[in-house]
Amino acid sequence: MKTFFLIVHTIISVALIYMVQVQMSKFSELGGASEVEDFTPFLEEEKASTPVERSLLSCLYSFSFPA
């Protein structure tokens, strides 16, 4: 049963990350902030290596330091 919930949780997490990336790309197409470039110093400091890590750190950064 734990394995089932782990698989479901993973699928939901990946889907949410994908939805955030799609919304961020739509926002940048409309002339908003760029996707990752605004967080480049933070991401380099944290050594994010995959797109998923970069988007998670970007979300974390945006919630940690609101405008």
Curated annotation (Swiss-Prot):
Q: What is its main location?
A: membrane
**Periplasmic compartment residues:** 1-14, 64-67
Instruction: Give a GO cellular-component term.
Output: plasma membrane
The keyword Protein transport belongs to this UniProt entry's keyword annotation: yes
Task: Outline what the protein does.
Answer: Subunit of the protein translocation channel SecYEG.
- One GO term (biological process): protein transport
The family annotation for this protein states: Belongs to the SecG family.
What is the protein's species of origin? Thermotoga maritima (strain ATCC 43589 / DSM 3109 / JCM 10099 / NBRC 100826 / MSB8)
Membrane spanning residue stretches: 15-29, 54-63
Cytoplasmic topological segments: 30-53
Protein's name according to its UniProt entry: Protein-export membrane protein SecG
Q: In which compartments does the protein localize?
A: Cell membrane
Swiss-Prot/TrEMBL keywords: Cell membrane, Membrane, Protein transport, Translocation, Transmembrane, Transmembrane helix, Transport
Task: State if Glycoprotein is listed as a keyword.
Answer: no
Tell me the gene name. Answer: secG
Q: What domain of life does the native source organism fall in?
A: Bacteria
Its assembly, as annotated, is: Component of the Sec protein translocase complex. Heterotrimer consisting of SecY, SecE and SecG subunits. The heterotrimers can form oligomers, although 1 heterotrimer is thought to be able to translocate proteins. Interacts with SecDF, and other proteins may be involved. The channel interacts with SecA via subunit SecY.
